Amino acid sequence: PTDTLEIDLAARYESTLGQSSVEPKISALWTPAEGVFIRASAGSSFRLASENQSFGIGPSGTTIREIGGEVTQARALAVGNSNLLPEESDSWTVGVTWDVTDSLTLDLSYWEYEFTNLVTVVSPDDILLADQADGFITDPRIELFPGANNEICEITGRWDGVNLNTRPGDCMTGFDIALFKSGFINQNTVETNGVDFQVSYDFPFMGGDAGIRVNGAYVNRYAGTATDGSIIDVVGTDGSNVAGVGTNPQLRGNIIATYNRDNHSFRWTTRFTDGTELRNPRA
């Protein structure tokens, strides 16, 4: 039928470990003409931190930035945080599907998500950056080897930071760091929006059925609040050590070709991922 409107309302109640939430959702589907479908939805959700994030201890190693002319590795512990708040999100989407012919279908969707209280681990690099501004390491989350000095002389000015032969012997180097004690925190907010698209074409070919699909996603914005309070848009960058998220290419896509005949089938997939800049998005 055409010129029809369907509306669905739903809600989910969840109670775990003394925390509860009611998450509503509304969705609508409008068919203004034959082969044309317009849809929209809005809702919210929440997720508790995992057992490891709340109570676990995860050992790892990390490569730290140059200190005293030395780039080195140090041990790191990510300690659980029992006071983590649940992650929450609000989202809405709107899209249209058009069956142009029996063979050709076009699909376009716009989506927008806002996440709050996202759980992420504080990176050792962020701990070090926040603590070294005055040239001395005093953060209790950074443990030095016994007898090591906590002065970074290239910051305090006792060394030019270039010629290793002139570096005072009591100046701190990267090898003096024994351990980072990082932990999980609720990152403030992440906002993201973008577009998904797909073109599908099916046709008979050599006694069988062939099809071509072109689909992809374009991320317009992926911005989050870092541990220092700054707003970072990491789209198109490798910002995993800054915003607590992975690499974020702006465009991803697939071209899929299929062919089916009797008991035989063929599928070919070509994937495209946009390049990313290996840079600090805060720079």
Report the location of each language-model feature.
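Gram-negative outer-membrane beta-barrel transporters
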Residues: 114, 120-280
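Sequence/structural signature of outer-membrane beta-barrel proteins
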Residues: 12-18, 47-49, 89, 115-117, ...
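Outer-membrane beta-barrel signature, preferentially recognizing the C-terminal barrel domain
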Residues: 48-109, 113-115, 180-195, 200-205, ...
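Residue-level signature of outer-membrane beta-barrel architecture
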Residues: 1, 28-31, 44, 98-100, ...
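Membrane-embedded beta-strand positions of outer-membrane beta-barrel proteins
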Residues: 9, 26, 40, 94-96, ...
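Repeated loop/turn-to-beta-strand initiation elements of outer-membrane beta-barrel proteins
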Residues: 4-7, 35-38, 102-106, 207-210, ...
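Surface-exposed extracellular loop regions of Gram-negative outer-membrane beta-barrel proteins
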Residues: 1-29, 34-87, 89, 110-171, 265, 269-271
